[in-house]
Amino acid sequence: MANHIAINKAEIRTLIPHSGLMCLLDEVVQWDDRSIACVSNTHRDPANPLRRFGCLSAVHAFEYGAQAAAIHGGLRARAAGTIAPLGYLAALRNGRLHVTRLDYIHLPLQISATRLYGEGANTVYEFILSAATVLVAEGRVTVVQRA
């Protein structure tokens, strides 16, 4: 993976439609044309908008993976001198959760996503969430361009 300059949360917000607290990823640490590596501590934030009754279910790990894919699409478009078309999450496949709750994890989440195929907003990504050496979640998302 190529080492690009780290991208902070303020810049991430310019790449995806998520705003405020729904922008779940804190930093892009590396990316290249095929993949991205991000870090997040928002799973520990009591104000995380995905929490219910103070708990953050592991099912929301899939949103973290999808946001990494969206950020990657935005970075690829920007590198090509364009703006990424709006897309939506059309499918989740092979989703596996290896924990029950994200708020129990006291370490930063590491989110990696790899573009398997597709261009623009019509892409398939594989993602992995981990905390240090512990696998948290994994799956495959399909992003489709809005009509």
Identify what each model region corresponds to.
Residues 9-19:
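Short aromatic-glycine motifs in intrinsically disordered, low-complexity regions
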Residues 1-11:
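Single-stranded RNA-binding regions, centering on S1/OB-family and related RNA-binding modules
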